[in-house]
Amino acid sequence: MVQTKIHSAHNQLDSIIETLCWFLVLITWSVTIIRYPTLPAIIPIHFSPLGEADGFGSKAYIWLYPTVITILHAGLTIINNYPHTFNLTDNSHTQNTELQFKKITKIIRTLKLTVISLFTGTLLYTLLIT
């Protein structure tokens, strides 16, 4: 099967989403580095659906948040840079290929922002209640 390589330019919304993602990654690392020395030895590491802490662990667990966020950001960015490797149906390599690639990359970019925002929110909530 022939893979069509298309590198479409970002529009303004794409650039804003990418900038927000990078900003959130930097915020998670900065806040974690700044707050780590003042954290208690035991911190909440799991929350109930009501937002109440129901699991506790060493303060070293706080490093998982920025690490996971960075890995997710890098992975989704790499995947998004190679839309031609996605498993599209055979009829996708026609006139609408570029449109499909744009839609797919926008979905992945939005997913990246959503996931990073959720992890960042959880980190900030954890730091707020400790």
Per-range role (PLM):
Residues 1-11:
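Short, Lys/Arg-rich, polar N-terminal cytosolic tail immediately upstream
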Residues 9-24, 111:
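Alpha-helical transmembrane segments and their helix-start/interface "positive-inside/aromatic belt" motifs
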Residues 24, 28, 68-76:
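Alpha-helical transmembrane segments of multipass membrane proteins
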Residues 32-63:
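Active-site and channel-lining beta-strand-loop segments
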Residues 34-38, 73-90:
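Membrane-water interface of transmembrane alpha-helices
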Residues 52-72, 104-109:
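Interfacial helix-start motif at the membrane-water boundary
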Residues 82-106:
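Cytoplasmic juxtamembrane regions at transmembrane-helix boundaries
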Residues 122-130:
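Juxtamembrane boundary at the C-terminal end of a transmembrane helix
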